Amino acid sequence: MMGSHIDTVKNAGALDGCYGVLAGLAVARAFRQAGIRPQRSITIGAFTNEEGIRYQPDMMGSLVYARGLSVDAALNTVGIDGTRLGDELARIGYAG
């Protein structure tokens, strides 16, 4: 697995976290262009909610991936503004 997080805070570093995601994509592309077929599957992760500003706990995306939190529990999390994460993901077209 390769990847990182994509920031969810307003004044984060310009490319903080995105470098890891882009590096994973670059490796996969380089392998493909060179005709290299890895012995194992490559997974590229682009996790969200690393900081946990609006929805707790922090690092929620990677926590769900590692099975430390169920998808249902994450989607039913209520944020500091009273919104439910699953509803907000649907609202912005990120559900599913």
Where are these regions (language model features)?
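Soluble metallo-hydrolase cores and metallopeptidase-like ectodomains found primarily
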Residues: 1-10, 81-96
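Alpha-helical metal-binding/catalytic segments enriched in His/Glu/Asp
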Residues: 2-5, 11-50
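Short, well-ordered, mixed-charge alpha-helical segments that flank or form enzyme active sites
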Residues: 10-11, 50-56, 96
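Solvent-exposed, flexible loop/coil residues
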Residues: 13, 18-19, 23, 63-64, ...
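Generic secondary-structure signature for well-ordered alpha-helical cores
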Residues: 30-36, 70-74, 87-95
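A glycine-rich helix N-cap at a beta->alpha junction
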Residues: 49, 57-89
